[in-house]
From Swiss-Prot:
Gene3D superfamilies: 1.10.1610.10, 3.40.50.10210
Keyword Coiled coil: no
Superkingdom in the source lineage: Bacteria
Task performed by this protein: Catalyzes the synthesis of alpha-ribazole-5'-phosphate from nicotinate mononucleotide (NAMN) and 5,6-dimethylbenzimidazole (DMB).
Protein name, as recorded: Nicotinate-nucleotide--dimethylbenzimidazole phosphoribosyltransferase
Catalytic activity: 5,6-dimethylbenzimidazole + nicotinate beta-D-ribonucleotide = alpha-ribazole 5'-phosphate + nicotinate + H(+)
Gene designation: cobT
Annotated source species: Aromatoleum aromaticum (strain DSM 19018 / LMG 30748 / EbN1)
Coiled coil: none
Pfam families hit by this protein: DBI_PRT
Keywords: Cobalamin biosynthesis, Glycosyltransferase, Transferase
PANTHER family: NICOTINATE-NUCLEOTIDE--DIMETHYLBENZIMIDAZOLE PHOSPHORIBOSYLTRANSFERASE
Length: 344
C-alpha cells in the first residue's frame, strides 16, 4: 500500500519567520510557540495558518494477549470504556469539551457489539486480535484492511474541512503491543520500552516481561513495519497508523498523544518517513518507553505532565497551545502596525 506524502515545501520559511520576528516582542521571546507557529505555517503552506474543524479520533480494539494476564485490567474494560466515551464521561471527553474539540470513537476491533451509536464509527476488523504469544496477531489481509480504513477516516475528515487531528486509543493490553512494536522498529531493548501500563505491580510487570519474551521467541523481531504490525500490533494501532498516513497525505497537522499513539506513528513513519514534519508531539508520557520513542524520533514534546492514561488526553490538553501558535501568528500586532519602536 502506497501513501503519497510530500514534505512541506520549505520555500516559505523565511517569510513566515520574518512575520514571527516582526511581532511586538523580542526575538524568540515566545520560545517554542514560535517554532510551532512556523511548523503550522509550513504544513499549511501559508504565513497565516488557521486551525479548522479540529478533531480527536480515539481508536479502540481488543488484544488476544490480554487474556494471558498481560494487563492489570480484564479485557471487558475496553468495551466498558468505549461506553464511557460515548456517554461523555471519560477524561478525554472532559478535555475535548473544554477546548471545543470534536471527538469520535472508532471501533477498530473491540470484542463487543455496540450497535449503531452517535459518536461511534463501526470499523471493526475482527472482535480482537489473536494472541501473539501463540500466533501472529493479525493476518496480512486484516492489517491492510485496518490501514486502508484508517486512511479513509482521515480523508473523510479532510473532506469535511478538518485540518488538525489528534490521536487517542483504548485497548486493554495495548501497551504491551506498543512495547513489542517499538522494540522491533527501533532496536531499543525490550525491557527499556516495557512499563507498568495501566498499573501493574512488580509481579505483574515481571509476568509481562516473561510473556513478551515468549512472544519474541515465537515471532522474532521483524524490522519492517508491515511485518511487525502483523506479528504484534492491535487493530486500533494499525488503523491509527493508516489514519496518520492519510492525514499527512491531506497536509493535516497530526497531534500525537503518548506511548501507544507514538508506536502507531513509528509504524507510519517507517512506511513513509515524510510524515514526521506534520506531527506535533503533545507530551511526554510517564510510561518509560515513550521517552525512548521520542529520543529515537529526535523530537521534543510540548508538555511533561506525568500523564499515563492514553485516550488522547495529552493531545486534547496540548491543543490550546497549538491554537495559541496559530492565533499569535495571525492576531498579534507587528511593530509596524502597532507603531512600536523596535530599535535595540
Amino acid at each position: 500500500m502506497d501513501f503519497a506524502i510530500s514534505l512541506p515545501d520549505p520555500g516559505l520559511t523565511a517569510a513566515i519567520q520574518h512575520r514571527i520576528d516582526r511581532k511586538t516582542k523580542p526575538l524568540g521571546a515566545l520560545g517554542r510557540i514560535e517554532a510551532l507557529a512556523l511548523q503550522l505555517g509550513l504544513i499549511q503552506q501559508t504565513a497565516a495558518p488557521r486551525i479548522r474543524q479540529p478533531h480527536v479520533l480515539v481508536f479502540a480494539g481488543d488484544h488476544g494477549a490480554a487474556r494471558a494476564g498481560i494487563s492489570a485490567f480484564p479485557q471487558d474494560v475496553t468495551w466498558q470504556m468505549v461506553e464511557n466515551f460515548l456517554a461523555g464521561g471519560a477524561a478525554v471527553n472532559v478535555f475535548c469539551r473544554q477546548t471545543e474539540l470534536a471527538l469520535t470513537v472508532i471501533d477498530s476491533g473491540v470484542n463487543h457489539d455496540f450497535g449503531r451509536r452517535d459518536g461511534l464509527v463501526d470499523a471493526k476488523i475482527a472482535p480482537g486480535t489473536a494472541n501473539y504469544i501463540e500466533t501472529p496477531a493479525m493476518s496480512a489481509q486484516q492489517r491492510d484492511a485496518a490501514l486502508a480504513r484508517g486512511r479513509e477516516l482521515a480523508h473523510a475528515l479532510a473532506v469535511n474541512g478538518c485540518n488538525l487531528v489528534g490521536f487517542g486509543e483504548m485497548g486493554i493490553g495495548n501497551t504491551a503491543s506498543a512495547s513489542l512494536l517499538t522494540h522491533c522498529l527501533t532496536g531499543i531493548d525490550l525491557a527499556t520500552v516495557t512499563g507498568r501500563g495501566t498499573g501493574l505491580d512488580d509481579a505483574g510487570l515481571a509476568r509481562k516481561h516473561r510473556l513478551l519474551a515468549q512472544a519474541l521467541a515465537r515471532g522474532g523481531r521483524p524490522s519492517d513495519p508491515l511485518g511487525a504490525l502483523a506479528e504484534y500490533g492491535g487493530f486500533e494501532i494499525a488503523m491509527m497508523a493508516g489514519a496518520m498516513l492519510g492525514a499527512a497525505e491531506k497536509r493535516m497537522t497530526l497531534l500525537i498523544d503518548g506511548f501507544i499513539v507514538t508506536s502507531a506513528l513509528l509504524v507510519a513513519q517507517a512506511i513513509a518517513p515524510a510524515i514526521l514534519p506534520y506531527c506535533v508531539f503533545a507530551h511526554r508520557s510517564k510510561e518509560p518507553g515513550h521517552t525512548a520513542q521520542l529520543a529515537h524520533l529526535r523530537v521534543e514534546p510540548l508538555m511533561e505532565l506525568d500523564l499515563r492514561l492514553g485516550e488522547g488526553t495529552g493531545a486534547a490538553l496540548a491543543f490550546p497551545l497549538v491554537q495559541a501558535a496559530a492565533n499569535f501568528l495571525n492576531d498579534m500586532a507587528s511593530f509596524d502596525s502597532a507603531g512600536v519602536d523596535d530599535r535595540v
